[in-house]
Amino acid sequence: MARSDYLFTSESVSEGHPDKVCDRISDTVVDAYLAEMPEARLGVETLATTNRIVIAGEVRGPDSVTFARLEELTRAAVKDIGYEQDGFHWKNADVAIYLHAQSADIAQGVDASGNKDEGAGDQGIMFGYATDETPALMPAPIYYAHKILKDLADARKGRVGEAAKLGPDAKSQVTVRYEGGRPVEATQIVLSTQHLDESLDSQGVRAIVEPYIRAALPGSWVTDRTVWHVNPTGKFVIGGPDGDCGLTGRKIIVDTYGGAAPHGGGAFSGKDPTKVDRSAAYAARYLAKNVVAAGLSRRATIQLAYAIGVAKPLSIYVDLHGTGRVEEAKLEKVLGEILDLSPRGIRTHLGLNKPIYARTSAYGHFGREPDRDGGFSWEKTDLVATLKSALA
């Protein structure tokens, strides 16, 4: 029997975290190619360290996207994040680009030809999850860990009061107490943030960030019992890639559900939407969110599995965690009928062949508001009526 009273913790990292800098750059490259050629293929990895950025990977796209243009976009991304420090500066960092053509062996398995539909770009398993414990149908710990950092980043970049003294690199962690299976209280709050003023100590930083943290959390969640850990090492001036080397794809739990749901292991950033690590994970979230939004369950986990070069998923698995109002086996059948879960079908339905990915690189790929230009389309709940009708 599932526990109903427990503590659960999730963490988030800011857009200035070294790994997130790399995710942002990799997705900036993806967007640059998709803007010129919606069918472009990319697998782009980025490394960032002290005043050096290395971009490498495989590309099939137009020659109009030059390395000079990619360097310009990379510097603009780093500038937007806020890095203008001696050890990592958008203007002075060395940018090296090593992109080459996609493997023909991979392309032949993925490309559509004759009667063969477009196949998956790789094998793998992908999970989607939704829960009714927040308005965004996301687990509360990761949802609020993201919100804290996003609000602080907005204040820092907008130079709002004392928040202007903060740097781009930050991490948050929220421990939530559940009672009767519902989130009711934040028992522990961890916030480490870079600061530009070397005279600031932990108390000084807490004075800056605490109002934003309290505003981000539900009003009753912060109590006299809540334990705070703000910059517990005392000083955090050297940050970002100058303090720790960053790599694309190292924050896959931050990107998804904060550990509250399984993860298939594949990262998202730097990949075009033919790669099911990304597109099928988005589709699984889309399905799970619509299941919960339709009132068919309070929680839903969906797994999809693929083989390279094969169009249709090998399996669909649904777990409603004992909260369902419909048989899981029936739902598994219906989900495969109401949405074409081939790579092409997912990309077409969700409109994924667009430059919409740089914005996903920080503060979570899920639990976001859909954008008018098609960004975060997998967060829509437009399958609710179709689901209900198919199950009637």
Curated annotation (Swiss-Prot):
Note describing how the cofactor binds: Binds 2 divalent ions per subunit. Binds 1 potassium ion per subunit.
Protein name: S-adenosylmethionine synthase
Alphabetic keyword roster: ATP-binding, Cytoplasm, Magnesium, Metal-binding, Nucleotide-binding, One-carbon metabolism, Potassium, Transferase
Cofactor list: Mg(2+); K(+)
Region feature (Flexible loop): 102-112
Residues annotated for K(+) binding in this entry: 45
PROSITE patterns registered for this protein in UniProt: ADOMET_SYNTHASE_1 (PS00376), ADOMET_SYNTHASE_2 (PS00377)
UniProt pathway: Amino-acid biosynthesis; S-adenosyl-L-methionine biosynthesis; S-adenosyl-L-methionine from L-methionine: step 1/1
EC number: 2.5.1.6
Subunit details: Homotetramer; dimer of dimers.
A Pfam family matched in the record: S-AdoMet_synt_N
Any one GO BP annotation for this protein: one-carbon metabolic process
Domain of life from the UniProt record: Bacteria
Top enzyme category: transferase
Any Gene Ontology CC annotation: cytoplasm
InterPro entries with a match to the protein in the record: ADOMET_SYNTHASE_CS, S-AdoMet_synt_C, S-AdoMet_synt_central, S-AdoMet_synt_N, S-AdoMet_synthetase, S-AdoMet_synthetase_sfam
Family to which the UniProt record says this protein belongs: Belongs to the AdoMet synthase family.
Localization, UniProt: Cytoplasm
Binding positions for ATP per the UniProt entry: 17, 169-171, 235-236, 244, 250-251, 267, 271
